[in-house]
Amino acid sequence: MDYYYINITTKDGEVMNWDGDNFIEYNDNVDDVKRYNTMEQAESAWDKAVELARSMQAKDIRITKAEFLADIVDFGIETVKLRDL
C-alpha cells in the first residue's frame, strides 16, 4: 500500500509535516500527520498547503510517497511532486 504526505522545508531548513490544516514539527509519531491514500487526494490539498507554506516563508513544498516494501519489510520514500517557493 502506498501513502502520500505533504511536507515543507522551512527557511531554517526544518522539515515539517502537513496535518490537513497546518504544518507541524516533524517527528516519529505520524498519528497527527495527514496521510492520503492516492496522489489525487494529496493534490486536492496542495493549493491550501502551498498558500500556508508561502505565508511561513518555506523554502519548498513536496508530496512524498511512502511505499511499503514487503520483501524487506520497510518503507521506500520518494518525492513525487516538488515546488520551490
Regions picked out by a protein language model, each given a short descriptive name:
Residues M39-L85:
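Short, mixed-charge low-complexity intrinsically disordered segments
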Residues M1-D32:
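Short aromatic-glycine-(Arg/Gly/Cys) micro-motifs in beta-strand/loop hairpins
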